[in-house]
Amino acid sequence: MGASGRLLRAVIMGAPGSGKGTGSSRITKHFELKHLSSGDLLRQNMLQGTEIAVLAKSFIDQGKLIPDDDMTRLALHELKNLTQCSWLLDGFPRTLPQAEALDRVYQIDTVINLNVPFEVIKLRLTARWIHPASGRVYNIEFNPPKTVGIDDLTGEPLIQREDDKPETVIKRLKAYEAQTEPVLQYYQKKGVLETFSGTETNKIRPHVYSFLQMKVPETIQKASVTP
């Protein structure tokens, strides 16, 4: 457990559409943690044209997963720059070999699992439509266009991204479940897994904050409670 003067090593997990990305950003800002997102890390390396990014891109272009060894090397290399910081990992580890490799180098204090029912996520993601030219995003449930399928400003048709089509969403969720279930079981056995269940991210977040309040070293919290 995090104690005063100790650095926090945390991981956040959740399916695509669970609110993990937004949640991570808010948590890291509130508690002044370093946020290491595997997606951001890959994009940053691709911009720099690093050797590992070129390798990773070749797998992504073929629709394959980046091998565990390469993903682990990338994440651990970045974590070397954060030895004096408390951090939250987002998108890594994604597989059991990655979790085991991380464990050999760092002791993970807590793993936050955002458990949102797949049916809710499916509705959330498939309700999203975009106007390609401007990037404007509509949500049929919360922010619908004035006319179904039409952009409010230009009158041009809206499209649904391939990733947001129902059949793709179901496939992504099943792939996530198959890949991460062993990771969740691994952390459960270690006694560091904390699962937060619900259908609305805004209602889950306060419980995550309360839990982290007990975990985050006091030295970090002082800054976040100072007006």
From Swiss-Prot:
Name of the top EC class for this enzyme: transferase
UniProt-listed GO biological process terms: ADP biosynthetic process; AMP metabolic process; AMP phosphorylation; cerebellum development; dATP metabolic process; GTP metabolic process; ITP metabolic process; liver development
NCBIfam families: adk
Summary of subunit composition and partner proteins: Monomer.
HAMAP family membership: Adenylate_kinase_Adk, Adenylate_kinase_AK3
Function summary: Mitochondrial adenylate kinase with a specific GTP:AMP phosphotransferase activity. Could also use ITP as phosphate donor. Its physiological function is to recycle GTP into GDP which is necessary for the TCA cycle in the mitochondrial matrix.
Record localization: Mitochondrion matrix
The protein's name: GTP:AMP phosphotransferase AK3, mitochondrial
Residue positions binding GTP: 17, 19-22, 128, 138-139, 161, 172, 201
PANTHER family in the record: NUCLEOTIDE KINASE (PTHR23359)
Lineage: Eukaryota, Metazoa, Chordata, Craniata, Vertebrata
Similarity section: Belongs to the adenylate kinase family. AK3 subfamily.
